[in-house]
């Protein structure tokens, strides 16, 4: 930051922490970052950008930024992990952050499936956390029983911990306990129906 430009770089060790070296700096304006490993590559998610970076050489160099394709609040700390089991036959990265671009509200967990070329294909209908209310700094992890633990700042600016089944995350359920699905089983956030048309929905809730 000494030049007035704020960019993320990595520091790595090849000898179990005896010595440390600085890796390459990413090309875009960025702040603190989180890294996860998947299929032999490193994936870097940074604050101040709706993009991610990929390294094929353990952090020595980084790709140009790759857009996620969805919007989230990048003025907030973010968290990401690689899930230990396959999702739809692919390695899955779980990425958590607030989805409200103007405030730290409406948490989401997005699921990105690693493709053969290293790119991420993001599933539709991210998992909803504290929709419409405060959701700020978070930490996501996998528990010993292969479920997902999410620790985050809630609407009272207190720490809340949720334990979530991976199937609920993949299917886009909600920690608010109630959600709506259309005939195809997709989660619906809103819908407009003309007066001469019909549509059917199913209201579901957590046990």
Question: Where do the language-model regions lie?
Answer:
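Loop-centered beta-sheet repeat module
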Residues: 1-39
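Structural motif
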Residues: 5-9, 49-54, 103-110, 156-167
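Trp- and S/T/G-rich repeat-edge/linker motifs of beta-rich repeat architectures
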Residues: 13-14, 18-26, 60-70, 117-128, ...
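Entry beta-strands of beta-propeller and related beta-repeat scaffolds
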Residues: 40-43, 87-95, 146-150
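Loop/turn-rich, solvent-exposed surfaces of beta-rich toroidal or solenoidal domains
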Residues: 50, 70-119
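Conserved blade-ending motifs and adjacent loop-strand segments that build the rim/top face
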Residues: 69-77, 118-144
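Blade-level signature of beta-propeller repeat domains, shared across WD40, Kelch, NHL, RCC1
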Residues: 137-176
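Short, solvent-exposed loop/edge segments of extracellular or virion-exposed proteins
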Residues: 178-194
């Amino acid at each position: 930051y000494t030049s007035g430009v704020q960019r993320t770089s990595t520091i790595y060790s090849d000898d179990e922490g005896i010595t440390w070296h600085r890796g390459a700096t990413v090309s875009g304006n960025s702040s603190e970052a989180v890294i996860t490993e998947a299929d032999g590559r490193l994936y870097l998610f940074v604050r101040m950008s709706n993009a991610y970076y990929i390294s094929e050489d353990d952090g020595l160099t980084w790709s140009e930024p790759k857009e996620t394709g969805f919007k989230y609040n990048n003025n907030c700390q973010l968290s990401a992990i690689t899930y230990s089991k396959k999702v739809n036959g692919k390695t899955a990265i779980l990425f958590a952050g607030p989805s409200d671009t103007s405030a730290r509200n409406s948490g989401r967990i997005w699921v990105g499936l690693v493709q053969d070329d290293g790119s991420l294909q993001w599933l539709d209908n991210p998992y909803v956390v504290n929709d419409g209310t405060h959701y700020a700094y978070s930490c996501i992890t996998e528990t010993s029983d292969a479920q997902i633990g999410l620790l985050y700042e809630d609407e009272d600016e207190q720490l809340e911990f949720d334990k979530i089944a991976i199937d609920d995350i993949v299917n886009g359920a909600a920690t608010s306990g109630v959600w709506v699905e259309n005939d195809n089983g997709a989660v619906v956030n809103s819908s407009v129906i003309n007066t001469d048309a019909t549509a059917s929905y199913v209201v579901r809730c957590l046990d």
